[in-house]
């Protein structure tokens, strides 16, 4: 008998999204049916990681750009919310459970990444506490449902990386991004505004607070679309926008920059933007969500 597989449970099912597979399937189908597919297929997507009642509809716009028939490996880069981490970490699990079906971690890619010496191993507890990767698993399972036995996942928890570390990880992962059979999912939520987030930037010239937040987010989104890691870093230094996923975005932008050096032509476009609520007063708070896709020409 072989040892039992190490499984990461769907720890946020039943709270951040429904634990019922049939209900979840119907919700995801509903949101995806409302989204348009643009010029695809996406090599990478940016999509939010909040509870599905808040961001399920927004995320669908990114997942609609995925071509499951060519995708064999799904890299998921999410920020660490609970543990201090200065590097990137790999999961100790072999299987990630979802209410739809189980997803298998690509142990060969994991072994190759581990060999670089650039990664830590997170504990199963840390993995199950974290939601930034898990919130992409049901959508990944749904997008890939007709090819469920033909793909694996590569979850990577991204720490609070320095600019030079973002560049190193971007360089390392660029060879995987160059492969059309790989899909990268980058997991940020955008502005966290309000006193509870200790961030209350307000540009009165934009009108209501929520308009100012949208203007700030869309400025950042426009810079991400330029695919220039240095401009994005400068934007964050100037406005301190509370994008919890800035480091996964930084890694993607650096991977893209590496491929551009080799003459690979790409463009990124955002397809949807949403806010959890519209802030009008100083006592209000909101989180913003954005969905977009990277297309390689």
Curated annotation (Swiss-Prot):
Q: Which residues cross the membrane?
A: none
Q: Which InterPro entries match?
A: MEMO1_fam
Per its UniProt record, what Gene3D superfamilies does this chain match? LigB-like
Q: Which domain of life is it from?
A: Eukaryota
Similarity-based family = Belongs to the MEMO1 family.
What job does this protein perform?
May control cell migration by relaying extracellular chemotactic signals to the microtubule cytoskeleton. Mediator of ERBB2 signaling.
* NCBIfam families according to UniProt: AmmeMemoSam_B
Question: Its quaternary structure?
Answer: Interacts with ERBB2.
Name of the protein in its database record = Protein MEMO1
Q: Which organism is it from?
A: Danio rerio
Q: What is the gene called?
A: memo1
């Amino acid at each position: 008998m072989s040892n039992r597989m190490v499984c990461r449970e769907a720890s946020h099912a039943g709270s951040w999204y429904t634990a019922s597979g049939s209900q979840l399937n119907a919700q995801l189908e509903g949101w995806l049916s409302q989204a348009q597919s643009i010029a695809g297929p996406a090599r990478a997507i940016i999509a939010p990681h909040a509870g599905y009642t808040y961001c399920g509809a927004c995320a669908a716009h990114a997942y609609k750009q995925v071509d499951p028939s060519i995708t064999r490996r799904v890299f998921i880069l999410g920020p660490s919310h609970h543990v201090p981490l200065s590097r990137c970490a790999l999961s100790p699990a072999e299987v990630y459970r979802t209410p739809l079906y189980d997803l298998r971690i690509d142990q060969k890619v994991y072994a190759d990444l581990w060999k670089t010496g650039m990664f830590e191993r997170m504990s199963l507890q840390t993995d199950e506490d974290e939601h930034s990767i898990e919130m992409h698993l049901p959508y990944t399972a749904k997008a890939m449902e007709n090819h469920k036995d033909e793909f694996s996942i590569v979850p990577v928890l991204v720490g609070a990386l320095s600019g030079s570390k973002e560049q190193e990880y971007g360089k390392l992962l660029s060879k995987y991004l160059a492969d059309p059979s790989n899909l990268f999912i980058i997991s940020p939520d955008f502005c966290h505004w309000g006193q509870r987030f200790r961030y209350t930037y307000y540009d009165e010239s934009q009108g209501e607070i929520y308009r100012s937040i949208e203007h700030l987010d869309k400025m950042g989104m426009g810079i991400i679309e330029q695919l220039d890691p240095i401009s994005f870093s400068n934007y964050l230094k100037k406005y301190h926008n509370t994008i919890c996923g800035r480091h996964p975005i930084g890694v993607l932008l650096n991977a893209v920059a590496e491929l551009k050096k080799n003459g690979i032509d790409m463009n990124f476009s955002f397809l949807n933007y949403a806010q959890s609520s519209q802030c009008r007063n100083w006592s209000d708070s909101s989180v913003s969500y954005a969905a977009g896709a990277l297309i390689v020409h």
